[in-house]
Amino acid sequence: MPYDIAIIGAGPAGATLARLLDKRYKVLLLDKRDLMEPEEGERTKCCGGLLAPDAQEVLGRMGLAVPAGVLVDRQLFLVRTIDFDNHLERYYQRFYLNMDRKRFDEWMVSLIPPHVDMGMKCRFTALSERSEGYEIAFIHQNRIYTERVRVMVAADGAWSNVRRQVFPELEGIRRYITIQEWYETQEDIPYYGAIFDSTVTDFYSWIIAKDGRMIIGSALEPDREARSKFEKLKGELRDFGYFFGKRIKREGAYLLRPLSASGIITGNDHMALVGEAAGFISPSSAEGISYAIRSAIALADSLNQGIEGFQYRYRQNLKSLKRNIMLKRIKSTAMYNKTLRGLIMRSGILSTDIME
């Protein structure tokens, strides 16, 4: 018997959708990780692991409270903004939750009801269109399996295999590669760091303290100079007074940045895209969890009214989310223009004075 809905990717978007779909549907959820019985040292998503206020708000609206076991030491409420272009530094108050991203994903998966079939350690490979949906292929323990599905959902992130197989590259979205390194540190870092340097990236870089370690990361153009630019960033931070101990690990991933509404793809009559696979991510901060969850809620609402015509309803449900993305795009114009950013930082507006 074919599945009504197959979801590729069990991150916040896929897990939320699987949890909210009506139990009358036969649902399959696939992920290449094992988020139900994780193994020590298993690869994790390259993510700073900060839960922004927008994501906290949407979790609260769903009646969900983040378990203490998901949070890490320490919880910080200040952002140190370092602008190497303008030789400026300011502090701003922000209320992020500092968390373990892997444990967050595991918690979201644990909320999925038992009627959903979950295939962990399953790597989606291919699809073929049929008159009433798709036939999908995936690999589990070196064996190839196929299933027929009426609706396929791509929730597999920026480097979405589903999106790349079905939809062309669009000019309305820009692709980056994120490099993130974890270091041992003896430093007391009571803030998050946001670093701007246009010689490194036209986006931004970051510093995060997490469980006694220091994370240094950057969103870079995916070219041959990415590694050297990342090393340049680390050199600047050393000169600025940061000390890195032994490197623990290095991570990398792709990141999307929507430049216009045309870069967002919602799918077709037998397919839907959610979260970053669709292009839902903040173009100013790269925050994606709130958009992943909100797009999944919009899709669940449209599918729970029936499969027929779901794509039209999904697009209608997404209008406010698309407007939000475009407002963030306008905000990013000021943030990433070094002249405008310099004027704003020099004015001290919304900044916080640190007590000595």
Model-identified regions with their sequence ranges:
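Conserved FAD-binding catalytic core of PHBH/FMO-like flavoproteins
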Residues: Y145, V151, W159-K234
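Extreme N-terminal starter segment of soluble prokaryotic enzymes
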Residues: M1-I5
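FAD/FMN-dependent oxidoreductases across multiple families
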Residues: A126, R224-L299, E308
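Glycine-rich Rossmann-fold phosphate-binding loop(s) that bind the pyrophosphate
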Residues: G9-G11
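N-terminal Rossmann-fold NAD(P) dinucleotide-binding loop
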Residues: G14-A15
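C-terminal helical "tail/cap" subdomain of flavin- and related membrane-associated enzymes
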Residues: D301-E356
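Glycine-rich FAD pyrophosphate-binding loop
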Residues: A6, L20-K45
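Conserved N-terminal helical subregion
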Residues: E57-R61, A65-Q165, G172-Y176
